[in-house]
């Protein structure tokens, strides 16, 4: 654990079809359960909850995006949920059914413990990793950077 620092992450996915489409019903139906499991997971600190620009792609200029913005106590805690939680993994195995491939869909960065990132900051981090690849300001699971 990184005393005084937490890990923020944004991941985005672009739906193949419009929201509410029967093709994505299984994904949309699973969101509440997956979010509840995340909130109960060891190391979970915060997640963006809301409607409008807090949950959709309006900040990104794309209404087919779904956005997940969370803060965890450590990269290990985030990885444990993302890769070892069976319910989350089951949803992730089906992602190609629902989403198109994006050049950059995940960015992680360090925040002070107790801080909550804005969606605008998260978008800037995702843009940064898309432009430059992993850096200390925006990285991924394969190329993590230590806290400042």
Feature-to-residue mapping (PLM):
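Tryptophan-centric aromatic hotspots in well-structured domains and transmembrane helices
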Residues: 46, 71-72, 98-99
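An amphipathic, aromatic/His-enriched active-site/gating alpha helix that lines ligand/cofactor pockets
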Residues: 75-103
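Short S/T/G/P-rich N-terminal loop/turn motif that feeds into the first structured element of a domain
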Residues: 1-65, 77, 104-148
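Short cationic amphipathic helices and targeting signals
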Residues: 66-70
């Amino acid at each position: 654990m990184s005393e005084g620092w937490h890990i923020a992450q944004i991941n985005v996915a672009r739906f193949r079809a419009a929201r509410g489409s029967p093709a994505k019903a299984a994904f949309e139906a699973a969101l509440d359960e997956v979010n509840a499991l995340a909130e109960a997971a060891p190391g979970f600190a915060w997640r963006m909850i809301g409607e409008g620009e807090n949950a959709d792609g309006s900040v990104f200029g794309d209404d087919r995006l779904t956005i997940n913005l969370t803060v965890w106590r450590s990269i290990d805690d985030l990885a444990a949920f993302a890769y070892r939680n069976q319910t989350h993994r089951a949803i992730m195995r089906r992602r190609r059914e629902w989403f198109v491939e994006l050049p950059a869909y995940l960015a992680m960065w360090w925040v002070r413990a107790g801080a909550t990132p804005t969606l605008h900051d998260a978008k800037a981090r995702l843009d940064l990793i898309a432009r430059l690849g992993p850096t200390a300001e925006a990285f991924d699971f394969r190329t993590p950077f230590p806290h400042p």
